[in-house]
From Swiss-Prot:
Hydrolyzes diadenosine 5',5'''-P1,P4-tetraphosphate to yield ADP. Keywords: Hydrolase. The keyword Ribosomal protein does not apply. It catalyses: P(1),P(4)-bis(5'-adenosyl) tetraphosphate + H2O = 2 ADP + 2 H(+). The lineage of its organism: Bacteria, Pseudomonadati, Pseudomonadota, Gammaproteobacteria, Pseudomonadales. NCBIfam families: apaH (TIGR00668), PRK00166.1 (NF001204). It comes from the Bacteria. Disulfide bonds: none annotated. This is Bis(5'-nucleosyl)-tetraphosphatase, symmetrical. Its EC number is 3.6.1.41. GO terms for molecular function: bis(5'-nucleosyl)-tetraphosphatase (symmetrical) activity. The keyword Hydrolase applies. The gene is apaH.
Amino acid sequence: MAVYAVGDLQGCLEPLQCLLEHVHFNPEHDRLWLVGDLVNRGPQSLETLRYLYGLRESLVCVLGNHDLHLLAVARKHELLKKGDTLREILEAPDRDELLGWVRRQKLMHYDAERNVAMVHAGIAPQWSLKKALKHAAEVEQALQEDQLYGAFLDGMYGNEPAKWDNDLQGVTRLRVITNYFTRMRFCTSDGKLDLKSKEGVETAIPGYAPWFSHPKRKTRELKIIFGHWAALEGRCDEPGVFALDSGCVWGGSMTLLNVDTLERHQCNCDAVGHAANGLVKSAQAGTATNPQAQEPRQ
């Protein structure tokens, strides 16, 4: 059995199918891990969700900020934004089935056999593996329990509080947990978030650094797979940390990682997220090559 992890899809189905065909993915034997942001901005958000739903028995997903945005818009807790490509999902006859499936996905996945965690954006440097799983479960419970769901979506948006505190309660507590797992790029060594900076690691403001680079990060013995940060172009020099968002929806590429061998495969994408000539490049981890994404990241 092979386990493959793929970076942000954002409604770009063609490159995913190209990659899975390239590695001869067999859903009867292999497993597919997805780092979240399954939908939005790309040309095939509805088709992507339907395709993934059909693969659900062979699939592990964690939720990204765009997936949570979809749930909020569907419940009318948030309005569609310029550039969103979610309307076709909201108007689909099978929307409730698809959205119900999205609600049941995780915020963090941990494979104990491989000692590998997968999240969308990152893990707060001050959290251990045990604490990270515990806090992810708090948000997962809010997503899956009807009596908590609406209040969570109502209070999910916002940049404050910018730092974790064990005494936080209610929706405020859930918001900061969600921001760590689905929006984080830069933070201080004690976890204070900068949610405005979205470019490369060299753009960190004084006192801040990429979440994965802090020397005292409590998950250094853990392998971590993440997406979200398109400006990294699928590259991360931190040992044991694997960045998979290579800017497919911005004309970069979509990246697939064999979780066991660490071999990478990338499908080049055009400016709107379609596969570009079906071209797939293969390389060892850390040697990804793809065009630089030129659009602003979210």
